[in-house]
Amino acid sequence: MTIWVDADACPKMIKDILFRAAIRTNTNLILVANSYLTYPNSPFIRSVLVEKGYDRADHYITSHMKAKDLVITADIPLAAEVIVKQGLAMSPRGELFTANNIKQRLTLRDINEQLRSAGERTGGPSALSAKEKTNFANALDRWLVKSK
């Protein structure tokens, strides 16, 4: 199993948790981004640099991931594609996206996008809290235990 990270928007503290987990459990971790990243020297961690452009990292991830791989992303359409490909998608806040909740999340995203297009200020996500960081670490550990 492999952990894929939509790395351009992934918070540093979440990447740090992922680095430690990959090294501790000998799990492959692939960071996909359109900018250069720094990461620990480990045979289990690598990065893929994609061209700058709309959804380039997303397309790379969905074309290379396998069923049961874990994808870390806050991008709802990417999470939906991962689910279709029988992967597991998790947000940097530790929320699991599933076949049961992804349609609702896509609808909410589309509504917010329409509001922004109409000039409404919808605001972005709040900063990651300590509780959300813990939720992410716990959800990741559960996946690692199940996948081994």
From Swiss-Prot:
InterPro entries: UPF0178. Disulfide bonds: none annotated. HAMAP family: UPF0178. Transmembrane segments: none annotated. It comes from Legionella pneumophila (strain Corby). The lineage of its organism: Bacteria, Pseudomonadati, Pseudomonadota, Gammaproteobacteria, Legionellales. It holds the Pfam family DUF188. CDD domains: PIN_YqxD-like. This is UPF0178 protein LPC_0108. Belongs to the UPF0178 family.
